[in-house]
Amino acid sequence: MAMVYIKMSFHNTIVTVIDGRANVLSWCSSGVCKFKGRQKTTAFATKIVITRALKSVLERGFNGIDIKVSGPGFGRNVAIRAIIKMGFKVFSLKDITPLPYNGCRPRKRRRT
């Protein structure tokens, strides 16, 4: 069983696939797929990144997958749908976006 980590930011999408022993099987990002600038955050770019990262995993014989998504980026649903369309069985889906519980003190407010 493989684990897929999808990190989505407002400027890029990075997908890393690891096996049960934490060895990286494949990875891909929007920039590697030749998307530049604001095209990197589109849902289409996310779909291409997912299919490119998981193609080699499918060839190795993995069919079950755990998905972990982090970040506030666009195209989360598109990413999950693309994984299911490729024929993988999704065992778990987690959102691991870090949320601060009143973390660092904010900067002072600007006076106008």
From Swiss-Prot:
A GO cellular component entry from the record: ribosome
Matches recorded under InterPro entries: Ribosomal_uS11 (IPR001971), Ribosomal_uS11_sf (IPR036967)
Major site of localization recorded for this protein: plastid
Entry's localization field: Plastid
Alphabetized PANTHER family for the sequence: 40S RIBOSOMAL PROTEIN S14/30S RIBOSOMAL PROTEIN S11
The organism's taxonomic lineage, starting at the top: Eukaryota, Discoba, Euglenozoa, Euglenida, Spirocuta
Subunit structure: Part of the 30S ribosomal subunit.
Family indicated by similarity: Belongs to the universal ribosomal protein uS11 family.
GO molecular function, one term: rRNA binding
Full protein name: Small ribosomal subunit protein uS11c
Biological process terms in GO annotation: translation
Gene this chain is encoded by: rps11
UniProt KW keywords: Plastid, Ribonucleoprotein, Ribosomal protein, RNA-binding, rRNA-binding
Entry keyword RNA-binding: yes
SS bond list: none
